[in-house]
């Protein structure tokens, strides 16, 4: 008998279904029935080492067709996704853009 639930199990409990996962990241989706949209959360590896976590409406793209609309995460959701980043080895403390 297991005592603790995995991060993926906890994310599933709050509606996030894992779409894919590999060494370069993971992707999750959940449907918001109140506002009728799909929220997607991506954890992606970047060659720079500044790996990213982004949450957005998967179907809504901006007028210039260069990006999606951001969807916020609660503190609990962010905590779970940060744990997932750490599990994948994609959590880094590097911040900002060098230049």
Tell what function each PLM region has.
Residues 2-20:
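Amphipathic alpha-helical segments
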Residues 2-6, 24-40, 44-99:
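Intrinsically disordered, low-complexity regulatory regions enriched in serine/threonine/proline
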């Amino acid at each position: 008998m297991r005592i603790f639930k995995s991060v993926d199990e906890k994310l599933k409990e709050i509606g996030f279904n894992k779409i894919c996962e590999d060494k370069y990241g993971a992707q999750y989706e959940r449907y918001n029935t109140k506002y009728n949209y799909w929220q997607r959360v991506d954890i992606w590896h970047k060659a720079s080492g500044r790996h990213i976590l982004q949450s957005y409406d998967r179907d809504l793209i901006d007028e210039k067709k260069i990006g999606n609309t951001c969807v916020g995460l609660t503190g609990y959701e962010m905590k779970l996704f940060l744990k997932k980043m750490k599990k994948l080895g994609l959590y880094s403390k590097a911040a900002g853009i060098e230049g």
